[in-house]
Amino acid sequence: MRILGLDFGSKTVGVAVSDELLITAQGVEIVRRKSPSKLRQTLARIEEIIAEYKVDRIVLGYPKNMNNTEGERCEKTKEFGDMLARRTGLEVIYWDERLTTVAADRSMMETGIRRENRKEFVDEIAAIFILQGYLDYLSNSRS
C-alpha cells in the first residue's frame, strides 16, 4: 500500500509518494499543466503514477488561508480532488497545506539551492511536506 501526495497549483502539480511501510514520503515529479483550464493531461499523468506505484489513497494539499478560511484556491483544489476521485475511484484526503511552500523554500535555501533554481522544485518539495505530515499523523494515531 502506498499513498500519493499532491500539491496542486495553477501551473504545476507537485507529486510525492510514500514508501510501502507508510513511514517516509519521496518526491516523484512535477507535472506541468499545459493550460490551467484543461486538466485531462494532468489527470492522465497522475493516473499513470498511481498505477506505477500501486497507490490506494491520495492526500491533496488544501490551501486554507492563515485565518482558517477557505478562498478561491480551496474551491479549485476541491474541484480537482473531486475529478481525481471520480477518475481513479480512490479516496482523496484534503490535508491542510498552510506554510508547506514556505517550509519547502526554506529547506532548499538551507541546502544552498539558488533562488532561481528553487522555483523548479518547490511544488515537489511541498508535496513531500504535505504527504509526510499525513504519514506522521497516521503514525501518531496508531501509537
From Swiss-Prot:
Pfam assignment, any one: RuvX
InterPro entries linked to this entry: RNaseH-like_sf (IPR012337), YqgF (IPR005227), YqgF/RNaseH-like_dom (IPR006641), YqgF/RNaseH-like_dom_sf (IPR037027)
Example of a GO MF term: nuclease activity
Gene3D superfamilies given in the database record: YqgF/RNase H-like domain (3.30.420.140)
SMART domains (UniProt xref): YqgFc (SM00732)
Entry EC no(s): 3.1.-.-
GO BP: rRNA 5'-end processing
Localization per record: Cytoplasm
Keywords on record: Cytoplasm, Hydrolase, Nuclease, Ribosome biogenesis
Entry GO terms, CC: cytosol
Family, per entry: Belongs to the YqgF nuclease family.
Protein role: Could be a nuclease involved in processing of the 5'-end of pre-16S rRNA.
Protein name, entry field: Putative pre-16S rRNA nuclease
The organism of origin for this protein: Agathobacter rectalis (strain ATCC 33656 / DSM 3377 / JCM 17463 / KCTC 5835 / VPI 0990)
